From Swiss-Prot:
<dbReference type="GO" id="GO:0050830">
    <property type="term" value="P:defense response to Gram-positive bacterium"/>
</dbReference>
<keyword id="KW-0165">Cleavage on pair of basic residues</keyword>
<dbReference type="InterPro" id="IPR004275">
    <property type="entry name" value="Frog_antimicrobial_propeptide"/>
</dbReference>
<comment type="similarity">
    <text>Belongs to the frog skin active peptide (FSAP) family. Esculentin subfamily.</text>
</comment>
<keyword id="KW-1015">Disulfide bond</keyword>
<keyword id="KW-0878">Amphibian defense peptide</keyword>
<feature type="signal peptide">
    <location>
        <begin position="1"/>
        <end position="22"/>
    </location>
</feature>
<dbReference type="InterPro" id="IPR012521">
    <property type="entry name" value="Antimicrobial_frog_2"/>
</dbReference>
<comment type="function">
    <text>Antimicrobial peptide.</text>
</comment>
<keyword id="KW-0732">Signal</keyword>
<feature type="disulfide bond">
    <location>
        <begin position="72"/>
        <end position="78"/>
    </location>
</feature>
<feature type="propeptide">
    <location>
        <begin position="23"/>
        <end position="39"/>
    </location>
</feature>
<keyword id="KW-0929">Antimicrobial</keyword>
<keyword id="KW-0044">Antibiotic</keyword>
<dbReference type="Pfam" id="PF08023">
    <property type="entry name" value="Antimicrobial_2"/>
</dbReference>
<protein>
    <recommendedName>
        <fullName>Esculentin-2Vb</fullName>
    </recommendedName>
</protein>
<dbReference type="GO" id="GO:0005576">
    <property type="term" value="C:extracellular region"/>
</dbReference>
Length: 78
């Protein structure tokens, strides 16, 4: 009976150690993954900002062209 308790205690102890090592590795992997996520988020926000600027510039140019076309049609100078 005593040897069975010792072996169960040993198994519990070894299982606890292996579990804690796995959790440490998982934590290290998650820390590395956070850096990649932040980099992806940063890249996405940069692309999003560039897209907004491009759309605003395109909208202004189209607006100017539209106004020029309308004024040309009204004054019949086209």
């Amino acid at each position: 009976m005593f040897t069975m308790k010792k072996s169960l205690l040993l198994l519990f102890f070894l299982g606890t150690i292996s579990l804690s090592l796995c959790e440490e590795e998982r934590g290290a992997d998650e820390e590395e993954g956070d850096g990649e996520k932040l980099m992806k988020r940063g890249l996405f926000s940069i692309l999003k900002g560039v897209g907004k600027i491009a759309i605003k510039g395109l909208g202004k140019n189209l607006g100017k062209m539209g106004l020029d076309l309308v004024s040309c049609k009204i004054s019949k100078e086209c």
